[in-house]
């Protein structure tokens, strides 16, 4: 039995929580899907599903496998589409891996600036965390990485690098919302905080800055998404220090944004793989992203190439203090 079909069956059962529903979606019999799941579990030596009520849910091992299977199947689909494009001489899409802040805050306007109508570039965008963005570029899965620091790697070319200070997001009925800022860090002491949960990068620098200032906060919610953090802040879970890019894309009612008296830099840019040619349209998109960042962020600073390494090294050192 095709291993690809087995993985497709696993993913459908994981998504739908039912062998019957997965079989209907795949157009095969229920016993066939059951056999495929049993074969996969036998080969791996681990149960991948357990029953909770009427649904099948992934075991911890099954959850770990899911991301890899989704990525592998998406890669197969992309490969098939690229093969058809080569045969049909269609211009392939620019493959981009981006963190959510840049995908949401820069890419749409950069795409519009890079061309209109028939001249607009075709894009294939995957939204990932910073480490996976870098891996996608180095492995060749993506031609462009739109990501945040850390960015230093010998196999990457840093096309441009910029910084902008993080901001404080509070509910519009919060006492701090009545101020104009900048807000001192000590004003956050004892408050409930909606925090970002990534181990490195700006979440680590936020934690290090609060720790260095002796500011004790109660983290009520941690999330990897700025949009998700803002939703919790609006719902009353607390206040939050967030990167500034997401907020430039769309105004969020119920949220007040304030500057901080202590600068916590959000460092971001575009990377490509060293030694790999970059198509002209991809280069135009990279340049357009920089222009959009400069236009959207009043406090944006473009870092000269000769200062890239020292800045990124200093940010990494700051994170290490935590």
At which residue positions do the language-model features occur?
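Short helix-boundary/capping micro-motifs
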Residues: 11-29
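Alpha-helical linker/hinge and terminal dimerization helices associated
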Residues: 43-44, 65-87
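Central regulatory/effector-binding core of bacterial HTH transcription factors
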Residues: 91-154, 223
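Flexible hinge/capping segments at coil-to-helix
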Residues: 156-193
């Amino acid at each position: 039995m095709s291993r690809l079909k087995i993985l497709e069956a696993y993913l459908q059962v994981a998504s739908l929580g039912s062998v019957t529903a997965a079989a209907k979606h795949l157009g095969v019999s229920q016993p066939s899907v059951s056999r495929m799941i049993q074969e996969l579990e036998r080969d791996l030596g681990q149960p991948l599903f357990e029953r909770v009520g009427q649904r099948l849910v992934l075991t911890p091992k099954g959850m770990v496998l899911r991301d890899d299977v989704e990525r592998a199947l998406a890669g197969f689909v992309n490969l098939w589409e690229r093969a058809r494009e080569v045969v049909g001489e269609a211009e392939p899409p620019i493959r981009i891996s981006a963190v959510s802040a840049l995908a949401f805050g820069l890419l749409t306007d950069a795409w519009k600036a890079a061309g209109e109508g028939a001249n607009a570039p075709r894009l294939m965008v995957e939204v990932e965390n910073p480490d996976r963005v870098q891996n996608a570029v180095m492995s060749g899965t993506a031609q462009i990485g739109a990501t945040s620091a850390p960015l230093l790697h010998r196999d990457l070319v840093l096309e441009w690098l910029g910084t902008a200070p993080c901001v404080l997001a509070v509910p519009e009925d919060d006492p701090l919302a009545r101020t104009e800022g900048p807000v001192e860090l000590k004003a956050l002491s004892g408050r409930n905080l909606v925090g970002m949960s990534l181990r490195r990068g700006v979440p680590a620098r936020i934690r290090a800055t609060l720790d260095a200032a002796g500011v004790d906060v109660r983290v009520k919610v941690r999330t990897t998404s700025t949009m998700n953090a803002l939703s919790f802040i609006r719902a009353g879970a607390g206040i939050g220090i967030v990167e500034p890019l997401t907020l430039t894309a769309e105004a969020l009612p119920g949220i007040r944004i304030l500057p901080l008296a202590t600068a916590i830099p959000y460092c971001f840019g575009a990377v490509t793989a060293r030694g790999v040619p970059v198509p002209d349209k991809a280069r135009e998109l990279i340049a357009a992203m920089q222009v959009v960042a400069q236009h959207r962020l009043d406090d944006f600073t473009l870092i000269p190439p000769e200062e890239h390494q020292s800045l990124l090294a200093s940010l990494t050192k700051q994170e290490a203090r935590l």
